[in-house]
């Protein structure tokens, strides 16, 4: 397995993510999306002594989460040696130590992808509301786009494990619609998608970049995608 980790100014958190992955013997691709802090330096220093393979892709300027995930995924696929690809953010809100639980759910159900679900009591109210509408929108979009019914309870959760074979030729969209785009295309390919609860911790260093404007932009992109593809 290999984890794709988009990171932007995560010098306070990225090392914790990598250390947990090392304990699990999970390789990592960190995509530093134009950070102005020491994120890349920390990754480089860790990689020198790590017991896992740690790859660093550095964008000179911030290109957005979708582009970061796209670059990381294409790189991981080019290595041609991983059955599963994990997606987890670099802010340590999600815990890598939940990976075994996600993998067990994936294998026990013979699924092709497992999406993390955050318990609502751990999510700020404004995020609960935006996530509810985003999940409804994406579930309806999937039905229109793939002619298959899926109900996603937490489509905005970026913590996922997906079989590498389903990520070939994947379109990642732009900005914060990336999780939605991946869900749409997995459904179109007939992938079996299951969900599993994961831990989440909102802390002072973890900054939310989601705004109402961005949520509306995600909706616009999803609608545009299903009718133009």
Curated annotation (Swiss-Prot):
It holds the Pfam family Glycos_transf_2. GO terms for biological process: protein N-linked glycosylation. InterPro entries: Glyco_trans_2-like, Glycosyltransferase_2, Nucleotide-diphossugar_trans. It comes from the Archaea. This is Uncharacterized protein MJ0544.
């Amino acid at each position: 397995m290999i984890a794709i980790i988009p990171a932007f100014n995560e010098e306070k958190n990225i090392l914790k993510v990598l250390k947990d992955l090392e304990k699990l013997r999970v390789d990592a691709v960190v995509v530093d999306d134009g950070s102005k802090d020491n994120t890349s330096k920390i990754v480089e220093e860790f990689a020198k002594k790590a017991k896992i393979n740690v790859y660093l892709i550095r964008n000179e300027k911030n290109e957005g989460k979708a582009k970061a995930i796209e670059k990381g995924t294409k790189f991981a696929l080019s290595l041609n040696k991983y059955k599963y690809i994990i997606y987890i953010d670099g802010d340590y809100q999600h815990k890598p130590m939940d990976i075994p639980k996600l993998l067990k759910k994936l294998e026990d159900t013979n699924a092709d992808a497992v999406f993390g679900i955050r318990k609502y009591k751990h999510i700020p109210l404004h995020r609960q509301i935006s996530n509810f509408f985003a999940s409804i929108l994406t579930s309806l979009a999937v039905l229109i786009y793939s002619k298959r019914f899926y109900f996603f309870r937490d489509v905005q959760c970026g913590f996922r494990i997906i079989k590498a074979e389903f990520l070939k030729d994947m379109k990642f969209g732009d900005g914060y619609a990336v999780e939605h785009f991946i869900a749409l295309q997995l459904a179109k390919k007939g992938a079996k998608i299951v969900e599993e609860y994961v831990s989440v911790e909102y802390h002072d260093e973890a900054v939310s970049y989601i705004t109402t404007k961005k949520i509306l932009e995600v909706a616009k992109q999803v609608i545009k995608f299903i009718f133009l593809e």
